[in-house]
Amino acid sequence: MMVLKVEELVTGKKNGGGDAGEFLPEDFRDGEYEAAVTLEKQEDLKTLPAHFVSLGEQQWKIEKEREAELKKKKLEQRSKLENLEDLEIIIQLKKRKKYRKTKVPVVKEPEPEVITEPVDVPRFLKAALENKLPVVEKFLSDKNNPDVCDEYKRTALHRACLEGHLAIVEKLIEAGAQIEFRDMLESTAIHWASRGGNLDVLKLLLNKGAKISARDKLLSTALHVAVRTGHYECAEHLIACEADLNAKDREGDTPLHDAVRLNRYKMIRLLITYGADLNVKNCAGKTPMDLVLNWQNGTKAIFDSLKENSYKASRIATF
């Protein structure tokens, strides 16, 4: 019995001997290359004289041939891709298999924090900012003043309103926190909720009696603040609650002045839709329309300058 060469195995060509152990091209169809390689490795045994093959080796050879035959049958049973539908089916099966293997992580809910020691003012104010309700509850349960504040007169309510921590806002109000308490710039909770863009907190404050007309040190209303910070939903809700569309701040600017100056198109459209006055003048004698024209003229001047500089540069480049 002759030994197959590697090139004979790969090409499937026969040599002149025509032994029964050799492979033909049809042996390599349908992905049977691996099975053929396994059989080729077993051909080495046939090169030994018959008297050198022990009983144990014969048994090992039979087992290997059986394994190769099983592998060949498995290869023959694989689906053949005849069209795109077959490919789609295989893709879907692989996806399902992958999905079955993927373990859904079990998310454990954090255990409620139990506070036993007294809570001081700095920790209380920080807890309101970071939404740590157990700390806030412990501070309030010890009959402490909910309106304690920092060096800028900002209370826990101000901080919670800014961050949108609704549960803490509710707890503070239940404990008697003053909704109209003013910080160093005379901002109230409604200003802070508008600044943070927290609609649910804003609604709660208004339902609890917060003054929609409250003004800070710059005479800004909550609507001014919502427009400046770009919180559309808060501005819309304040308008729906009859906030003054034409209220002037210390510089005489209305919310529409601010919207035009900051080029907030959606705010401009909202305010005009609900009837904001286009002709109200600020302390500089400018109406919102004047600001639009100034902005357009300023933009035009910038483009004219860029155009002129570009022309000069091109002229220099030609020389």
Curated annotation (Swiss-Prot):
Main location: nucleus
Pfam families per UniProt: Ank_2
Role noted for this protein: May play an important role in endothelial cell activation. May act as a nuclear transcription factor that negatively regulates the expression of cardiac genes.
ANK repeats: 152-181, 185-214, 218-247, 251-280, 284-315
GO cellular component: cytoplasm; nucleus; perinuclear region of cytoplasm
Coiled-coil regions listed in the entry: 63-89
Known partners and oligomeric status: Interacts with TTN/titin and YBX1.
Gene Ontology biological process: regulation of transcription by RNA polymerase II
Protein name: Ankyrin repeat domain-containing protein 1
Keyword DNA repair tagged: no
InterPro entries from the UniProt entry: Ankyrin_rpt, Ankyrin_rpt-contain_sf
Key words of the record: ANK repeat, Coiled coil, Nucleus, Repeat
Subcellular location: Nucleus
Family annotation (Gene3D superfamilies): Ankyrin repeat-containing domain
Up-regulation conditions: Down-regulated by doxorubicin (adriamycin), in vitro.
GO MF, any single term: titin binding
